[in-house]
């Protein structure tokens, strides 16, 4: 369970860092990660 929470926090951090607030747009998050 801890790992799941950690993953969710990591995704949230990436959304804030990349300026993407849409949780539905996972592709945008991954794109920002690989840039």
UniProtKB/Swiss-Prot annotation:
Keywords: Signal
Keyword Signal in annotation: yes
Origin superkingdom: Eukaryota
Annotated signal peptide: 1-18
GO cellular component: a single term: fungal-type vacuole
Protein name: Uncharacterized protein YMR272W-B
Species this protein is from: Saccharomyces cerevisiae (strain ATCC 204508 / S288c) (Baker's yeast)
